Regions:
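Structural preference for alpha-helix termini/caps and helix-kink/transition segments
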Residues: 238-240, 244-398
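N-terminal catalytic cores of NTP/NDP-binding nucleotidyl/phosphoryl-transfer enzymes
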Residues: 1-45, 52, 56, 82-83, ...
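Short phosphate-binding/catalytic loops that engage adenosine nucleotides
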Residues: 28, 102, 384
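A glycine-rich helix N-cap at a beta->alpha junction
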Residues: 62-75, 221-222
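Alpha-helical recognition segments enriched in aromatics with Gly/Pro capping
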Residues: 1-2, 13-17, 88-258
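A non-catalytic, amphipathic alpha-helix used as a structural packing/dimerization or gating element
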Residues: 18, 56, 60-67, 249, ...
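Alpha-helix C-terminal capping/helix-coil junction sites
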Residues: 24, 70, 98-99, 227, ...
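Short secondary-structure capping/junction motifs at helix and strand boundaries
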Residues: 70-81, 100-110
Length: 398
């Protein structure tokens, strides 16, 4: 984390948050770990540019990242470890790999992983070692003539002037990127994990190297399943407000259901309503079938829209509280899986509302009806509906 996140960074967080929510919806207890790399070349470069410490840079942007995720209704991870807090674990794992013959220290203290010693290297990315070998430049050209083999990758690197470092048996330095994830995964999830997730750009070499390190150290398979999200591509098409409008339709439907539930004079559902409640179970089935199909959120959202249309048509003023409550419960459960927020936030205070109403009244008295209408529209945009009565202006949140 060396800068503010953009939509491409947020995408995997949202995708895997949805996967997590669905698993929890299905009754699984999910231990969700999302780590932060808080020391690497990009963070150090940013720190030098700003004249501050790497820790200050990473702390600032981790805080901003968490805030942005909260604003997007992404649930906090069960654990969110930071690499710099797990250095000793990295040193221990590297030493284990050296002891087992899978890693070796060079003369300057750099520690490398012996790729060819792990016979299954390339099994995730389906890359062939011979093809990889032919694609590498010579040791002399690459400037890494300490390596036994061009394919070997760094586990520990020596410190450079002005960089953060930690003491180790090999040299003062810092860990390589790949070892960080193996160590934090083992500490918080165990030697063998159920699902490992990330962007498709991480399949090789990062995830491939994680597998090599972890399996050579622990002697068991690293992950049972892998989930990789594709890149987000944005072309020249005009970006519309359709997504926002779609969410507004859902939140409006939820608000109406709450009103029906509260205002209903009849509590228990009629026989016809009970039949319609059975029909609503069909939307749940459609939703689950979509999510079971490789987390097909597009079809899952379509099922939610069908439910909204059904609710708007069938939950009326005379509907029972039971029918309205059940419909709202179904809608809320499905929307929660997708991370959609059904509660409209009260982003305007009562005092502000009263002040604007007073200003509107003054405008009407001055026959400035344009301003009066403008204020009514402003309040409506914020979810406040005005009603002029003989007793004065009444307002309510909608």
């Amino acid at each position: 984390v060396y800068n503010l996140i953009h939509i491409g960074n947020a995408r995997p967080m949202i995708i895997f948050d949805t996967a997590r929510r669905y698993m929890e919806y299905k009754g699984y207890e999910v231990n969700y770990v999302s780590n932060f790399t808080d020391v690497d070349d990009k963070i150090i470069k940013k720190a030098i540019e700003e004249g501050v410490s790497a820790e200050e840079v990473s702390t600032r942007y981790i805080k901003e990242c968490k805030k942005d995720m909260a604003d997007m209704n992404v649930k906090p991870a069960t654990t969110a470890p930071q690499a710099t807090q797990e250095i000793q674990g990295m040193i221990d794992m590297i030493q284990t790999l050296i002891d087992k013959g899978y890693a070796y220290p060079a003369a300057d203290g750099t520690v490398y992983f012996r790729v060819k010693k792990f016979k299954e290297y390339g099994k995730l990315s389906h890359k062939n070692l011979d093809d990889l070998q032919s694609g590498f430049r010579s040791l002399k050209v690459s400037g890494e003539d300490q390596k036994e083999d061009p394919l070997d990758f760094v586990l520990w690197k020596p410190k450079k002037e002005g960089e953060p470092f930690w003491k180790s048996p090999w040299c003062d330095g810092r860990p390589g990127w790949h070892i960080e994830c193996s160590v934090m995964s083992k500490k918080y999830l165990g030697e063998e994990i159920d699902i490992h997730a990330g962007g498709e750009d991480l399949v090789f070499p990062h995830h491939e190297n994680e597998i090599a390190q972890s399996e050579c150290c622990n002697g068991v398979p690293f992950a049972k399943y892998w989930m990789h999200n594709a890149f987000l591509n944005i072309d020249n098409r005009k970006m519309s407000k359709s997504s926002k409008n779609a969410l507004e339709r859902i939140t409006d439907a939820a608000a109406r259901l709450r009103d029906r539930q509260t205002a209903a004079s009849v509590q228990e559902a009629s026989e016809d309503e009970k039949q319609m409640m059975q029909e609503e179970a069909g939307f749940i089935t459609k939703f689950e079938e979509a999510m079971d199909d490789d987390f097909n959120t597009a079809d899952a959202l379509a099922a939610v829209f069908e439910l909204v249309k059904f609710a708007n048509t069938n939950v009326q003023e005379g509907s029972s509280a039971e029918f309205a409550a059940y419909t709202l419960e179904v809608m809320t459960k499905l929307c929660d899986v997708l991370g959609l927020i059904l509660d409209k936030k009260d982003d305007i205070l009562d005092e502000e509302i009263e002040n604007l109403i007073a200003e509107r009244q003054a405008a009407r008295k001055a026959k400035d009806f344009a301003r009066a209408d403008e204020i009514r529209g402003l309040l409506l945009d914020k979810g406040i509906e005005l009603k002029d009565t003989r007793e004065g202006v009444k307002w309510k949140r909608i």
